[in-house]
């Protein structure tokens, strides 16, 4: 097998990145956008010792689970890499990811629930971050082609709230009209690197964030004025990112016009969201995710709960009405200020948040005599540190509720908890990100009586 060779392949499976998997001459071949059951003629793009990557030239036998995608670019860019698969099969694929991870970890006895579908299959995202680059001599927005930094221009982002799409295009046109130079990442020059737009499903408020190389540029005043006149926009912010880096946001935000925050809701709890706040992307699915976690935790009115990695308090403040007290911690100081302000905003008096690392704060609270019944944790994709796991176990809660955006690190962490006397018998997948391979999951660990 060699590069550029055309081969016929029978697709037998999907990889965790949703690439078609085939086998030929003892090698595994990953085929972009191919589905199990399909027979394809494919061109080999990269050939390694034990595996190869290929792209479809022709589908000879099509899967009944394939659907036609209006814009090929949605799949090409990875913006919606499952858009060609029927939604019920996407849910099945996500459940299988969890089943396979448990199987590899010799945990076949753990029950995996059916993936909870999202109320919206498209247009569900309450936030978009899109790169701004020059394409064919003019400023454009879109998404990078998979595994590259080539911008594919787009006018519709499919998974994003259509109101956000409308604002993105209007802002693009304002930047063009005012001859604002797009960022050039090779030479680290130009002005606007990214556009970020956040919209509250609850209030309709829209925040526009210009991520810029410089904190001022000649057209900024006029651009701000024109953006502020777009219907629905309540905030215009400049985020200053002067570094030559792939990191999207810089550390400093400047309010150019309007309100410093927008307000959204999870269930009946309101949250003020700042430009850099972490807030779950799928507004309609988030309350269902939290309700599932609360139900599985079987909380009691006398419970004391720790909300670790608390962000702006979304989980803890959603839990507060079910329990006696919520204590939370987070390393990002502005997020802690927002969490305490959000408690006040909702008249929640039994929740408080502090700045600090969970692995340092939890043992301190335990020494001070705090008896914790339940820990809720929703870590970043890399999962929990061994130090956190040790500190959580030392805190000796009856239960640990683990909400994960990466089942691979979740299964790893659950095994570490298991070794330290906490057991679990079920994982429930939740679809927070339809049209993408990402899967959220919930598990409840219970202390086994030693």
Curated annotation (Swiss-Prot):
E.C. code: 2.1.1.-
InterPro entries: MeTrfase_TrmA_AS, MeTrfase_TrmA_CS, NA-bd_OB-fold, SAM-dependent_MTases_sf, TRAM_dom, U5_MeTrfase_fam
Keywords: Methyltransferase, S-adenosyl-L-methionine, Transferase
Segments forming domain TRAM: 1-58
Annotated residues for binding of S-adenosyl-L-methionine: 280, 309, 330, 378
Gene3D superfamilies xrefs: 2.40.50.1070, Nucleic acid-binding proteins, Vaccinia Virus protein VP39
GO BP, sorted A to Z: rRNA base methylation
List of catalytic residues: 405 (nucleophile)
SUPFAM superfamilies listed in its UniProt record: Nucleic acid-binding proteins, S-adenosyl-L-methionine-dependent methyltransferases
PROSITE patterns on file: SAM_MT_RNA_M5U (PS51687), TRAM (PS50926), TRMA_1 (PS01230), TRMA_2 (PS01231)
GO molecular function: rRNA (uridine-C5-)-methyltransferase activity
CDD domains to which the protein is assigned, alphabetical: AdoMet_MTases
Protein family (similarity comment): Belongs to the class I-like SAM-binding methyltransferase superfamily. RNA M5U methyltransferase family.
This protein's name: Uncharacterized RNA methyltransferase LJ_1698
């Amino acid at each position: 097998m060699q590069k550029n060779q055309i081969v016929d392949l029978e697709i037998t499976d999907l990889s965790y990145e949703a690439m078609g998997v085939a086998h030929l001459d003892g090698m595994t071949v990953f085929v972009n956008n191919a589905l199990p059951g399909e027979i394809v003629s494919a061109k080999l793009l990269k050939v390694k010792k034990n595996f190869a990557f290929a792209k479809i030239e022709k589908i000879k036998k099509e899967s009944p689970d394939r659907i036609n995608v209006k814009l090929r670019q949605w799949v090409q860019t990875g913006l919606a890499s499952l858009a060609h698969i029927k939604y019920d099969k996407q849910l099945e694929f996500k459940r299988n990811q969890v089943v396979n991870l448990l199987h590899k970890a010799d945990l076949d006895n753990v029950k995996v629930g059916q993936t909870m579908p999202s109320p919206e299959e498209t247009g569900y995202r309450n936030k978009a971050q899109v790169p701004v680059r020059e394409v064919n001599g003019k400023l454009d927005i879109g998404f990078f082609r998979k595994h590259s930094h080539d911008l594919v221009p787009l006018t519709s982002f499919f998974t994003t709230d259509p109101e956000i799409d409308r604002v993105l295009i209007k802002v693009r046109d304002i930047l063009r009209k005012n001859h604002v130079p797009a960022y050039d990442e090779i030479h680290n020059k130009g002005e606007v690197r990214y556009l970020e737009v956040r919209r509250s499903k609850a209030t309709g408020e829209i925040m526009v964030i210009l991520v810029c190389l410089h904190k001022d540029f000649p057209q900024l005043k006029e651009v701000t004025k024109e953006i502020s006149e777009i219907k629905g926009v309540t905030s215009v912010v400049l985020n200053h990112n002067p570094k030559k880096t792939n990191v999207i946001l810089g550390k400093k935000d400047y309010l150019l016009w309007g309100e410093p925050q927008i307000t959204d809701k999870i269930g009946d709890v309101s949250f003020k969201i700042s430009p850099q706040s972490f807030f779950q992307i799928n507004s309609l699915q988030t309350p269902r995710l939290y309700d599932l976690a609360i139900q599985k935790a079987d909380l009691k009115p006398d419970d004391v709960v720790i909300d670790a990695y608390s962000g702006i308090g979304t989980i803890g403040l959603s839990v507060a009405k079910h329990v006696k007290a919520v204590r939370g911690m987070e390393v990002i100081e502005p997020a802690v200020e927002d969490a305490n302000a959000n408690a006040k905003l909702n008249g929640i008096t039994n929740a408080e948040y502090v700045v600090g690392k969970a692995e340092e704060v939890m043992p301190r609270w335990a020494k001070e005599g705090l008896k914790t019944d339940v820990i809720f944790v929703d870590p970043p994709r890399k999962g929990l540190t061994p130090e956190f796991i040790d500190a959580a176990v030392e805190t000796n809660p009856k239960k640990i509720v683990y909400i994960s955006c990466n089942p691979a690190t979740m299964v790893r962490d659950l095994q570490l908890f298991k070794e330290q006397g906490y057991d679990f018998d079920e994982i429930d997948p939740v679809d927070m990100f339809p049209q993408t391979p990402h899967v959220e999951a919930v598990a409840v660990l219970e202390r086994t009586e030693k």
